[in-house]
Amino acid sequence: MRLSHFFTYYRTLGGVQSVLKRHHAADVKRGHEPAFLFAFESDDFAEPNFTGLGFGGAHSISSMRARFANHSSRFTDSVAICHNMWGLQFLADLMPAKRRVGLLHSDWTGLRPFLETQRGLLDGVLCVSNALVELVSSCLPDLTKSNRVKLIPYPVDGLTAMPERAPLAGRTVVIGWVGRMQTEQKRVERLPGLAKALESAGIDFRFELLGDGPRQAWLEQQLPSDRTVFHGRKSADEYWAVLRRWDFITSVSDYEGLPISMLEAFSAGVLPICPAIGSGGDEYSAELGDEFVWEAFDFGQAASKLKSILAKPESTIGQARAEARALTNRHSEVEYFRTFDQFVARIADEPRVSAERLAKRPFYFSDRLPFGLMTRLWPNGCTRRNE
């Protein structure tokens, strides 16, 4: 089957990118003919089936459409896999695919109205968490009626064995965090507040941070230097060498889909200290017990819950680690691709439900504005449809 993957970025570090790399490595082996198109990447890929459109903040929707139209033929007779469905509102009519399937990896502020603008543009949606399945189902009821919204297990390469750990009693507790050090979504400026709450509760802890970003220098000034280790960006064995030493993993994000880093940590027996933000991470953490989820963003409650966990017998904590590890069993690459292939094949075989011919795009003054400016001043202008 011809597959046309479409997303914004490929070269950055993130969960969507890790999944796209798996598709690049495995789609052909599974009998597909894949192509990859990236909106904001430059067109200098070594891979012959990769194309970058070179979009930037100065581009307008009008200029984006003109450039995208030059690559419309890539979608002919294919199933378009629209990762996070970016740009479909103003590009779908230039995408002559047999079917359009959304693969929703993420949650974000304004996701509900964004999804509502996708009505009639998609033939099915795969979601990485039950929370996203519920949201998509409520926003796109026509897809729900015909069972075209489905959960897909995010693939992770976990550790093959649980690392050995010294008992928590009488030693420093290691709390990890993974991500890009930025305000948008990750809200890393909250980490110092969490650290202060843990100190006030008398918890002997050490923060270990994996990642980098624009707020790193600020964090280095604000977090206690004697309790914080900045590891920078790591990958492969270096990444696992850090993560396997952690006792807990936390987050202070405004929103998440299902964090791959949390699943990877679970595979190493790392336990969550998870804020309740309505993500897939909340759901998995709650399966281990209410004490692993704290009200966002009540840092005092987070410290109190961690203190109650630390007071438990080591055998109870060990059992929780084993249960966390067991939660990742369903997240194999084999299961991910089995679900993906079966769903896409079914959608391709069943009648089309997305609009095959969309209305000609009318004149919108906003289509002439710089996209980067519009995302800040008038985000709704970025999702106007051809109607």
Where are these regions (language model features)?
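A charged, aromatic-enriched C-terminal amphipathic alpha-helix characteristic of glycosyltransferases
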Residues: M162-P163, E314-L369
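Nucleotide-activated donor-binding/catalytic signature segment of Leloir-type glycosyltransferases, i.e.
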Residues: W218-K234
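Aromatic "clamp/platform" in nucleotide-sugar-dependent glycosyltransferases that forms part
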Residues: D254
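Short His-centered aromatic/hydrophobic patch
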Residues: I81-G87, L104-D107
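Conserved acidic donor-binding segment of nucleotide-sugar-dependent glycosyltransferases
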Residues: E291-G300, S308-E314
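Short hydrophobic beta-strand element within catalytic cores of glycosyltransferases
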Residues: L271-P275
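A short, active-site helix/loop in glycosyltransferases that binds the activated sugar's phosphate group
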Residues: R112, D123-R148, V156-G158
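Conserved donor-binding/catalytic core segment of Leloir-type glycosyltransferases
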Residues: S4, P167-K186, P192-A195
